[in-house]
């Protein structure tokens, strides 16, 4: 099935009342016409429409599309990206287990691992985003490897297949956060990953007005996560938000191509600027990671980072406050142009004082270059 079919028509063959736009089924309950119909639905509660905390027609349509985009058998929408991360982690770990996690993973993912370590005696090894180092960290107690590639602050790329081949031989589960590349540009399932998670808050919804997460994988894993973690913890996504994600999916491929086009222009400018020490954007052909990145991804997103040639926090502050088009804000993945200086966080190590992350949006890239240029002249 090609991407156009998935985004525009898959699962929408029988829309009620011949509507061209799939409806929002904003209801808590679903009724039954007979005892047998009700009994069948209650016995097959995973996919039947019974109660909002389970499945919903609007939500289920979007889940089918997301599973198809990721080349997975099934997917589940949840209330946030962190919900997707925590549910998938909880499912594969038990007290006394060991997990390997890339040390540049999303900070709240690491905080969750630290919480599990203290509360449930789970051992966590944080290792650099390098396949060989990850494989070397495996022990006899390892049950899960948690990946992020590219990582979301320094955009480091991992040889995913090298990790999954080693994990598969040892029957270790792998989970990856695929938010940076989106399912348009990277399909980790085809590289051997067991479960793929996303913050759908970002590119998948794409308009900066939805918070959601995605978990995708094999039917068996998805069914078990749904029954064991999802139904017990209850991170339910509203059908209205699922419908907004559906709206965002219509333009996902177009938006990702534009983000990539703009990011190449901006990263080229930064790579050539005398006040910039380093640019982290793996899908630029000039990047030292391009060969590996392009073997796993067909394009890049709008997220990158760079280092200024300074170790002064004041200079970094002056730079970001001089920007006019880029706005200081966390998160990323919609049309906006955003900037986050690493030093704004209280836990910033000295070596990262000059590290700045930007998200390149959907506008004219030359305006972004002009904005960066005028701000760089101020320092």
From Swiss-Prot:
Positions bearing N6-(pyridoxal phosphate)lysine: 202
Keyword check for Protease? no
Temperature dependence of the activity comes to: Optimum temperature is 70 degrees Celsius for the cystathionine beta-lyase activity.
* Classification via SUPFAM superfamilies: PLP-dependent transferases (SSF53383)
- Describe the reaction catalysed, as an equation: L-alanine = D-alanine; L-glutamate = D-glutamate; L,L-cystathionine + H2O = L-homocysteine + pyruvate + NH4(+)
Q: In which pathway does it act?
A: Cell wall biogenesis; peptidoglycan biosynthesis
Cofactor(s) listed: pyridoxal 5'-phosphate
GO term, biological process aspect, one? peptidoglycan biosynthetic process
InterPro entries noted in UniProt = Cys/Met-Metab_PyrdxlP-dep_enz, Cys_met_metab_PP, PyrdxlP-dep_Trfase, PyrdxlP-dep_Trfase_major, PyrdxlP-dep_Trfase_small, Trans-sulfuration_enzyme-like
Top-level lineage group:
Bacteria
Query: Which Enzyme Commission number(s) are on file for it?
Result: 5.1.1.1, 5.1.1.3
Which amino acid positions bind pyridoxal 5'-phosphate, per UniProt? 51-53, 81-82, 199-201
Q: Name one GO cellular component term.
A: cytoplasm
Entry keyword set: Cell shape, Isomerase, Lyase, Peptidoglycan synthesis, Pyridoxal phosphate
Regions that span the bilayer:
none
What GO molecular function terms would the record report?
Answer: alanine racemase activity; carbon-sulfur lyase activity; glutamate racemase activity; pyridoxal phosphate binding
Kindly give the PANTHER family that the UniProt entry links to this protein: CYSTATHIONINE GAMMA-LYASE, TRANS-SULFURATION ENZYME FAMILY MEMBER
Q: What does this protein do?
A: Catalyzes the racemization of L-alanine to D-alanine, and of L-glutamate to D-glutamate. The activity is low, but likely physiological since T.maritima lacks canonical alr and murI genes, while D-alanine and D-glutamate are essential components of peptidoglycan. Also displays a more efficient cystathionine beta-lyase (CBL) activity, cleaving cystathionine to homocysteine and pyruvate; however, this reaction seems not to be physiologically relevant since T.maritima possesses an O-acetyl-homoserine thiolase (MetY) that bypasses the need of CBL for methionine biosynthesis.
Entry's family note: Belongs to the trans-sulfuration enzymes family.
The record describes its quaternary structure and partners as:
Homotetramer; dimer of active dimers.
Supply the name of the protein: L-alanine/L-glutamate racemase
Q: Which organism is it from?
A: Thermotoga maritima (strain ATCC 43589 / DSM 3109 / JCM 10099 / NBRC 100826 / MSB8)
Q: Which gene encodes it?
A: aar
């Amino acid at each position: 099935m090609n991407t156009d079919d998935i985004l525009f028509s898959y699962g929408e063959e029988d829309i009620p009342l011949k509507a061209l736009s799939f409806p929002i089924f904003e209801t808590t309950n679903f009724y039954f016409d007979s005892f047998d119909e009700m009994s069948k639905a209650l016995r097959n509660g995973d996919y039947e429409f019974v109660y909002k905390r389970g499945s919903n027609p609007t939500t289920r349509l979007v889940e089918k599309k997301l599973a198809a985009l990721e080349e997975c058998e099934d997917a589940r929408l949840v209330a946030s990206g962190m919900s997707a991360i925590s549910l998938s982690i909880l499912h594969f770990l038990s007290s006394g287990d060991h997990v390997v996690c890339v040390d540049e993973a999303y900070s709240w993912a690491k905080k969750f691992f630290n919480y599990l370590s203290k509360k449930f005696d789970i051992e966590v090894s944080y290792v650099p985003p390098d396949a060989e180092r990850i494989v070397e960290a495996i022990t006899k107690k390892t049950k899960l490897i948690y990946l992020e590639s590219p990582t979301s602050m320094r955009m480091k790329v991992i040889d995913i297949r090298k990790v999954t081949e080693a994990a598969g031989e040892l029957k270790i589960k792998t989970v990856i956060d695929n938010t940076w590349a989106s399912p348009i540009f990277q399909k980790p399932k085809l590289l051997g990953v067991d479960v793929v998670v996303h913050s759908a808050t970002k590119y998948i919804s794409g308009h900066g007005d939805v918070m959601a997460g995605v978990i995708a994988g094999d039917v068996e894993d998805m069914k078990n996560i749904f029954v064991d973690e999802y139904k017990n913890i209850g991170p339910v996504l509203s059908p209205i938000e699922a419908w907004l994600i559906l709206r965002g999916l219509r333009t996902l491929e177009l938006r990702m191509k534009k983000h990539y086009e703009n990011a190449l222009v901006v990263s080229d400018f930064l790579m050539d600027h005398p006040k910039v020490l380093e640019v982290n954007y793996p899908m630029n052909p000039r990047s030292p990671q391009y060969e590996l990145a392009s073997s796993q991804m067909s394009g890049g997103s709008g997220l990158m980072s760079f280092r200024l040639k300074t170790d002064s926090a004041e200079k970094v502050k002056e730079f970001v406050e001089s920007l006019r088009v880029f706005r200081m804000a966390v998160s990323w993945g919609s049309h906006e142009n955003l900037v986050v200086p690493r030093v704004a966080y209280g836990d910033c190590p000295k070596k990262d004082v000059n590290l700045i992350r930007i998200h390149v949006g959907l506008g004219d890239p030359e305006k972004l270059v002009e904005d960066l240029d005028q701000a760089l002249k101020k320092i």
